[in-house]
Amino acid sequence: MMKFMCIFVCAIAAVSANAYGRQGYGSVPVGGYAYQVQPALTVKAIVPAGGYGGGSYGGGYGNNNYGRSIEVPVSAHYTSSRGYGAAPVDRQAISLAKLSLAAPNAGAPLVWKEPRQIVERSYGPQQSYGQKHSYGYGEQAQGASAAAASSSVAGQHSGYKNSGYKNSSY
């Protein structure tokens, strides 16, 4: 439904635009509403030779002046976005133009370059009442089994057998 309404409104706008006597290529109107979507170009805006406001719907669009355009400063052309003689002000494009004027030889686009920071979380002082070890639980278990194995090997070499003390040699 929304798509149909959008197509319907666009068709009415195209028919009414041609009804005002503007020239166009085929059925597509040229001129008139083009300034409403024209972005602000760096520091200067390209304007038709007759300007936007002279005559009916732009003096530069009639009289076969399609190829001619002049450059005027943005401040001289962009007055208010609500007035009929002005294009909407693209603040982002103007600020980018000011940045490019401030650093003309930058080359690469301006990117915020900062090394990555590793954030270490700190949860405050930790209180522990147990004995602190410098090794983990798995290493502690391996150390205990290695100590038991070494003691059993030492017992075998000194005359003890694996079965215990009942077969002792004294």
UniProtKB/Swiss-Prot annotation:
Name any Gene Ontology BP term: chorion-containing eggshell formation
- Give the Low complexity compositional bias ranges: 146-159
* Pfam families for this protein: Chorion_2
Signal among keywords: yes
Per its UniProt entry, which superkingdom is the organism in?
Eukaryota
Region annotation Disordered: where it falls in the sequence: 146-170
Keywords assigned by UniProt? Secreted, Signal
- Does the keyword Secreted feature in the UniProt annotation? yes
Q: Which residues form a coiled coil?
A: none
GO cellular component terms, A-Z: egg chorion; extracellular region
Q: Tell where it localizes.
A: Secreted
Which portions of the chain have biased composition (kind: Polar residues)?
A: 160-170
Q: Where is the signal peptide?
A: 1-17
**What protein family is recorded?**
Belongs to the chorion protein S15/S18 family.
What does this protein's UniProt record list under function? Chorion membrane (egg shell) protein; plays a role in protecting the egg from the environment.
- Name by which UniProt lists this protein: Chorion protein S18
Organism of origin: Drosophila virilis (Fruit fly)
Q: Please name the gene that encodes this protein.
A: Cp18
